[in-house]
C-alpha cells in the first residue's frame, strides 16, 4: 500500500469536494534556482486559488508521497540539492528506499490519479526528442497520457522536442490533443508551430465534458490540453528556431545524452535569449494553472 500525505489545504478541499489541481515539482528542483523557484511555485499556487480551485504540488519526501506541500516543505524542496527526478520508472523505488524526489509529468499523473485529482497543470510535456530515430529518446509522459485518466494542461510539448513526431506518437496512442482557443498547435514559448490543432475546444466547460465522456466510455488514458502562451509573453518561433538548432548542435558535439540533454538545452536557450525563455516559461505555467483551475471547477459541477 502507498501511503499518501495530504497537505492541510488539500485535505480540506478533498473532504469538502472542492476542485483540486495537481502541480509537478520538477519545476522547483530542476527548473530554476532558489529562491526564484519557490517564489514561482508559490505564485502558481496562488493563481489556482484565485481562479477558484485548490493547488496540490506533488513530491516525494523521505519516502512518502505528498499531495500538496506545506510552505516549509516547499522551502525545503526548493533549497535541496541532488533531488531525484522521478518518472514512472523511478517513483516506486524512491518510495521504497525512503528517498526524496520531484515528480515529472508522468509521475505527477500517477500520483494525482491515486489521490483522486483529475486535472494537472504543467509547463510543457516531454515527448519525442530530435534524433530519436537513432537515440530512441522518447519521454514516458506520452505513454502515461495513454493510460492514466488525468487531463493535463500544458503549453504543448517543449519546443526543444520533435513536435511532429511527438504528435504522431500521441495519435498512435489514442491521446486526445486538444488545443485551447486556436487552430494551430502551440510550441511552448511560441504560440505558433507548423502543425494544425488535432482538436480545438474553446471553453473549460467543454474540456471538462470531454474528460467526463472519456471516462463514461471506459476509454483508458487522459487528454492533453495545449494552451497557447499569452501573446504578450511569447517568443516568436522565427527567433527561437535558430537558437534551438544551435543548442542542439552543441549538445551533439559535446556528446550529451539521456536526462542531461534537456537541462543543457534549456540553459543554452536561456543564455541566448538573455533570460527571456525563463520569463516566458513562468508566464505560460501561470496561464496553464488558471485554465486548469477553470477545468477542475467545471468538472466538479458536472459530477456534483
Regions found by a protein language model. Give the residues of each.
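N-terminal glycine-/serine-/threonine-rich phosphate-binding loop
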Residues: 1-50, 114
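Solvent-exposed alpha-helices and their adjacent loops that cap or buttress functional pockets
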Residues: 12-15, 20-21, 110-114, 119-121, ...
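General beta-strand structural signal in soluble alpha/beta enzymes
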Residues: 21-23, 56-60, 101, 119-124, ...
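Glycine-rich nucleotide/cofactor/substrate-binding loop typically near the N-terminus or early
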Residues: 25, 30-32, 38-95, 216-232
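A glycine- and small-aliphatic-rich helix-loop capping segment at beta-alpha/alpha-beta transitions
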Residues: 35-41, 73-78, 127-146, 169
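Active-site glycine-rich loop that binds ribose-phosphate moieties when present
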Residues: 104, 133-171, 205-209
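Anionic-ligand binding region
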Residues: 190-216
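A C-terminal functional module that forms or caps the active site or interfaces directly
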Residues: 216-287
